[in-house]
């Protein structure tokens, strides 16, 4: 009798897992269909834009059973690139100031209204895109991955990000003696003896970041 109950529970568990797996697969198909509708609506529109647009979105991937379903929201998109870079900088500064993590996907796209782009459309196209992860509680405040040329442009447009990264690289290569000297010059006092090199770097980076954010 007990064995039969265990068998029933195992079968129920397996069936629940199978239903959830099918649910994830059907969600993936629905996402793909939605993307196809977005693209088709633009292609069939005689006024479909032919120039390159740009945008950025918040995203989060929910992965299970080998299927990843993206949640995303376009924050700003259009054809006035300088406005979008300015908006992107404001978003980066906001989340750093609030010490909140966020994952952003920055993209350029042609042949479709950038405000209608989805995560799947952007990542499956040949247009340049960049993943930007912001982690305010880490010394490595953010990192970018994607099209190298696009990354360089982003650093040029959002200068404080480039300056922070450059300062961080300089600190990493300093000897303990040089790092201690810089700490004394910056804070006009010696660091406590219990301070490690990583602790001194963290304090110097926080000081530098606060200056950059207020400039």
UniProtKB/Swiss-Prot annotation:
Name the UniProt record assigns to this protein: Uncharacterized protein R746
Annotated source species: Acanthamoeba polyphaga mimivirus
């Amino acid at each position: 009798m007990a064995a039969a109950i265990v068998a029933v529970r195992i079968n129920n568990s397996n069936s629940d897992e199978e239903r959830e797996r099918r649910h994830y697969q059907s969600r993936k198909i629905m996402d793909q269909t939605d993307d196809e509708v977005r693209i088709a609506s633009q292609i069939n529109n005689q006024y479909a834009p032919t120039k390159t647009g740009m945008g950025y979105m918040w995203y989060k991937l929910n992965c299970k059973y080998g299927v990843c379903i993206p949640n995303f929201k376009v924050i700003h998109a259009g054809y006035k690139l300088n406005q979008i870079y300015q908006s992107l900088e404001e978003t980066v500064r906001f989340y750093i100031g609030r010490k909140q993590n966020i994952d952003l996907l920055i993209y350029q796209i042609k042949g479709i209204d950038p405000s209608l782009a989805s995560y799947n459309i952007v990542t499956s196209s040949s247009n340049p895109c960049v993943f930007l992860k912001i982690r305010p509680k880490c010394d490595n405040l953010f990192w970018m991955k994607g099209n190298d040329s696009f990354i360089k442009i982003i650093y040029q447009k959002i200068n404080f990000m480039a300056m922070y990264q450059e300062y961080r690289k300089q600190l990493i290569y300093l000897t303990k003696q040089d790092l201690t000297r810089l700490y004394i010059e910056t804070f006009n006092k010696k660091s406590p003896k219990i301070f490690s090199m990583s602790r001194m770097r963290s304090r110097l980076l926080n000081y530098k970041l606060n200056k950059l954010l207020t400039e």
